[in-house]
Structures are given as C-alpha cells and as structure tokens.
Amino acid sequence: MRPLTLFIATTLSLLICAPTLAKTTLIHCGTLIDVPGQAPKHNQSILVIDNIIVSITDGFIDPGTIGTVDDFEFVDLSDSFVLPGLIDCHTHLTGEILPSHERMRRRTQESEAHAAIDGVVNAKKTVEAGFTTVRNVGSPGSVALALRDRINSGIVPGPRMFVSGPAVSVTGGHADSTNALSPILRPDLPSHLSTADGPSEARKAVRARIREGVDLIKITATGGVLSPTAAGVDQQFFDDELESIVQAARMMGRKVAAHAHGTDGINAALRAGVSSIEHGTYLDEESIRLFIENDAYLVPTIHAGKFVEDKAKIDGYFPDAIQKKAAEVGPLIQDSFARAHKAGVNIAFGTDVGVGAHGTNAQEFIYMHEAGMSNEDCLISATINAAKLIGAENQIGTLEPGKSADIIAVPSNPLDDISTMLHVQFVIANGRVIPLSQ
C-alpha cells in the first residue's frame, strides 16, 4: 500500500473509532521544526484528534480525504514556520510589578479575587504569545491553582500551568508576605503565610502545599530584589532547612525550584538537590560544577533583570530598599547566564514575567542570543529542555504522534532570526485553536 493511501486509511479508521464529539484538525505546515535541534522538514501535514497529535506525514493531505467528520477544522500554515508550543519555566500570571505606591495599594486594599481576574487576563496574553505551557512559581493562596484548573477544563484560554502556589520563605525573607506591613495589616490565617523556620516547619510547609494540589515547590533560598526589606540577596535558609525541603518534596514526587541570587545560597540549594536555580545572579565556578554534577537547570530570567535595571533609574518607582538591589543585581543576570551556558550548564527558558509585562516572554530569546546562545539552542531551551525540567517531556516539548497538540507558527525561520519569535501568528494550546487579539 502506498504511504499516502496508508495514511488516509489509518486516519479514517482513527476517526471512526474516535469518540462521537472528537474534534479533528488538519494542519498544513510549510516548514516544520518538530524536534528543535533536528533539521526542519518541508511540506508536512499534522493530524490532531481532540488534543493529541495523531500523525505527522510528508506532503499536504487533501482535506477532502479525511471523510465526513462533524467537528473538523483545516488550518493552512503552508507559508509559515511551525514549531512546538513554547514553555516558560518562570512566570507569575496572577500579578505584575507596578510603581511602589500602586503596589502597596494593591497589597493592602485588594483581595485574591482581584488577582484571579488579573490571572485570566494575563493567561490569555501569555498563550497568545505562543507560550502554551508555564511554570507559575509564586502566587497568593490558591489563585494560580484555580486558574490552572479552569484552563485545563477549557473554561479559560491560557497555557498549561504547573503551579507551585506560594513560595516557601524564612520569616522576614524574600517571600514573606507580611514584609513591610504594619502588624495590624498582617493576615491572621496561616494559609496566607509563606514562612518556615527550622527543618520541621520546612517539611510541613512542603507537605501543606502538596495537600493543596501544587505541582512543584518554590523556595526562596536567598534574599530577593523585590522584597521591600534591606535583607540583601544572600543565603536565607540554613542548609538543614534546604535539605529537609528537598527530601520532603521528593518523597511526595515533587521537584523544587529555588530562587537564588547570592553565591552561598545558590550553592547550598544545589548541594541540597534542587532541580533548578531561578536567576543565579552571583553563580561562580563551584556553582557551575554543582549544576553539572547534579544535572540541575538554570532558569535565567534575563527579562526580569532588564526590567528592574530600567525601573531602578526612575525616581520613586521602587522604595529605597528595592531600588538599590535592583540597580546592582539587574545588570548582572545576562552575564551570569552567558558564563553558565558557555560552561555547559542545562538552560531552561524562563522570564519571571509579572516582573515585566505579560505577553512579552519571547523577548528573553533576544537577550539569550545577545549573550551568545545560538538560535537553535534558544529554541531547545524553551521546548525540549523546559519540558525535561518540568518532567513532562513525554507530553510536550516536541511535535510527535501521541504528544499534546501544542503548536505555534511564526512568519520566518527562527534559526536565521530569533526575533521572529516576537511575531507568533497562530497558536494551538492543548488541541484548542487560540484566537489572537491582533
């Protein structure tokens, strides 16, 4: 039997056997980068049933050969470059960094309901930019968990979300939600707090988040730029606390992502066994050795570094405690990324959007390329590597039969010019075509 005839016969049998309400989508791809790092393919047809890629075949299949299907959509991308949906491993979809007075107003006068509404808007911006999967690493209460579930059910358009819930911090540390608040404004309910002191509390904080349904654990191993305290950016958890967190998370099947700027905190977190370091600003040769030895990932967030560097130049945008840290740390992140990448550290794409405008995630590609990463490796970082870090490489990261239908298209070849990733013109997220706003 000829290959094309066999393909059509197989397709028809799949459609006949599929559930009555199955959605069938046929996509013609002019150029297909199905597995970043491998040679592009030309004139390909992708068949999707519901949210799963059923087949990818050479040539443009005539839509008429699909047969009679109640819910059928044909997508012509024969003039486009088609890729796997992108993955951002560091986002905050339910918030955004604003000038200090507005940020404080929101902290004291708005509720989690406001954050939920913001999350719906920001999720749509993110998926329209071609990011069909994100790790959401830090958000108030259960807001991001609810957003994840509503996206999964198809009620809200947005990316597939892997959610950490509130980050775990030491008292007074980077993610202590009561920092800079008057005692009378501090929340009373323990569920609103993100602090843990000592190995026992650290283990309990991990278990409590897993009870709430998180997909991973986020910790703040060091101080942070945007916490409104003059506590620096060095190590904040003790080594035994870090070890307790990682051990408790592993026992329940969760990975740990560690926010870390200072060298001592980066290295302590890596020795404890975290899966990723977020930011990694002051990494050193020992850090690089530990990254490679532990097969850990750096999530660079250059996007956020550029944002805080720029805003630190505006009088009054940040309170004094933040302004000084932003001016010092922001300019260093891109260079730290460059050194890590050159040394062979695993890189997983991540922006820290929320620090910077939602929907601008692809700007990170430009910054990574400026720092010496090839266009091909940029794409690998946001697909294959990111999927491996999340632990979802059997579902996302490449376009292959049996994987999720997360598919995007851009107007020109990103291997020649990575800036084309700023101009996504088509998105399917988990089998759903996303109408674009522009």
Model-found features: residue ranges?
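Metal-associated gating/positioning segment near the N- to mid-region
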Residues: 80-155, 171-175, 240, 264, ...
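Histidine/acidic residue-rich metal-binding segments in metalloenzymes
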Residues: 146, 201-298, 327-347
